[in-house]
Swiss-Prot record:
The gene is UBXN6. The modification Phosphoserine is found at S96. Interacts with VCP through the PUB domain (via C-terminus) and VIM motif (via N-terminus); the interaction is direct. Forms a ternary complex with CAV1 and VCP. Interacts with SYVN1. Interacts with HERPUD1. Interacts with VCPKMT. May interact with DERL1. Interacts with PLAA, VCP and YOD1; may form a complex involved in macroautophagy. Interacts with LMAN1. The lineage of its organism: Eukaryota, Metazoa, Chordata, Craniata, Vertebrata. One of its GO terms (biological process) is endosome to lysosome transport via multivesicular body sorting pathway. One of its GO terms (molecular function) is ATPase binding. This is UBX domain-containing protein 6. Enhanced expression in testis. One of its GO terms (cellular component) is lysosomal membrane. The keyword Hydrolase does not apply.
Length: 441
């Protein structure tokens, strides 16, 4: 390979050196021999840049490793052809410079624009059912948890522990320590020392006192703060002491412990904003708000300009590491994705998803809208490419960001069985969805 590039460079230098000259020939003789109307020599062709040479060398090295087991030498033409085939194969796999499922996405617009495919990204509070903007999530959930103390203080304190404290490792350590306290009381109800927890204890201070919601939890399950005399000091110390009433109901402590260990942070749920549209030639056109992108407006414009150069990039020799780095950069550009599913009757089902959400969520979303939700079906990306059967794949890994138009297809074998039995599948979507069908603008 090194010899190939050395010969390539030498050939360029030789051709750019100009006409030959004899050693004994003078400059005057040379000028006399030249034709007076001879056109000016063309400028020498510029050689490949260092980056292009390095990338070419890396690609050729990969081919050399693959071909090292073959008999006989490999010609330079064969190497070039093999590199060209490899690049063409990569382009075929990817389908195009864009992912197979993506469609035309214009520049992001501000929320409130009349032609946005969705007005923005919204969430639903799991406690109140309120629809929230992204910047309203945390404040609304905290307020709902605090209001929940009036109806269920135990559940509210547990939600506060998991939700108000962001360091989940510290939360787990604190929760496990509280569970240990409750286990000791449950296993040794006759031991008075287990019914008292010293607040100034080092373990309590480092693992429990630093967490929001822990004091509310102790008080909600029956502990009371009491000042008790301390050994070898005049001033009393503060303890949590379990009340006699709670001690008489050990099963309640066990239930509260299990509830504490099984809890999770309260998170706002992404609002799918499910909509159904009439058949439209604009199905693949998406006007997305800025919330869908993890980029500034300037960065998005630059990405769109670079997208037009994708074909040219495919013709440049790149190492595998370079390609993987570009792919990973692309996966991090988007937070959300808007998907449309074209049904056999031409109607469109639309929903919003996280970019890193699993493919199974899309199948579940479509199945919930079907009148015959028990029938198997397939989803096809643009070009008729069937989506992966691995429902654990993330949507950005499937190229379905920041938007995509999918095609719905019944399982043909099952559909033929239904028709053979003299039946026809019911209307695809549920009646309540069809009653709210819209025109896509």
């Amino acid at each position: 390979m090194k010899k190939f590039f050395q010969e390539f460079k030498a050939d360029i230098k030789f051709k750019s050196a100009g006409p030959g000259q004899k050693l004994k020939e003078s400059v005057g003789e040379k000028a006399h021999k030249e034709k007076p109307n001879q056109p000016a020599p063309r400028p020498p062709r510029q050689g490949p840049t260092n980056e292009a040479q390095m990338a070419a060398a890396a690609a050729l090295a990969r081919l050399e490793q693959k071909q090292s087991r073959a008999w006989g030498p490999t010609s330079q033409d064969t190497i070039r052809n093999q590199v060209r085939k490899e690049l063409q194969a990569e382009a075929t796999v990817s389908g195009s410079p864009e992912a197979p499922g993506t469609n035309v996405v214009s520049e992001p617009r501000e929320e409130g624009s009349a032609h946005l495919a969705v007005p923005g990204v919204y969430f639903t509070c799991p406690l109140t059912g309120a629809t929230l903007r992204k910047d309203q999530r945390d404040a609304c959930i905290k307020e709902a948890i605090l209001l929940h103390f009036s109806t269920d203080p135990v559940a509210a304190s547990i939600m506060k522990i998991y939700t108000f404290n962001k360091d989940q490792d510290r939360v787990k350590l604190g929760v496990d320590t509280i569970a240990k306290y409750l286990d000791n009381i449950h296993l040794h109800p006759e031991e008075e020392k287990y019914r008292k927890i010293k607040l100034q204890n080092k373990v309590f201070q480092e693992r429990i006192n630093c967490l929001e919601g822990t004091h509310e939890f102790f008080e909600a399950i029956g502990f009371q703060k009491v000042l008790l005399p301390a050994q070898d000091q005049e001033d009393p110390e503060e303890f949590y002491v379990l009340s006699e009433t709670t001690l008489a109901q050990p099963q309640s402590l066990e239930r509260h412990k299990e509830q504490l260990l099984a809890a999770e942070p309260v998170r706002a749920k992404l609002d799918r904003q499910r909509r159904v549209f009439q058949p439209s030639p604009l199905a693949s056109q998406f006007e997305l708000p800025g919330d869908f992108f993890n980029l500034t407006a300037e960065e998005i414009k630059r990405e769109q300009r670079l997208r037009s150069e994708a074909v040219e990039r495919l013709s440049v020799l790149r190492t595998k590491a370079m390609r993987e780095k570009e792919e990973q950069r692309g996966l991090r550009k988007y937070n959300y994705t808007l998907l449309r599913v074209r049904l056999p009757d031409g109607c469109l089902l639309q929903g919003t998803f996280y970019a890193r959400e699993r493919l199974g969520a899309v199948y579940g979303f479509v199945r919930e809208a079907l009148q015959s939700d028990w029938l198997p079906f397939e989803l096809l990306a643009s070009g008729g490419q069937k989506l992966s059967e691995d429902e654990n794949l993330a949507l950005n890994e499937c190229g379905l960001v920041p938007s995509a138009l999918l095609t719905f297809s019944w399982d043909m074998a099952v559909l033929e069985d239904i028709k053979a039995a003299g039946a026809e599948p019911d209307s695809i979507l549920k009646p309540e969805l069809l009653s709210a069908i819209e025109k896509l603008l």
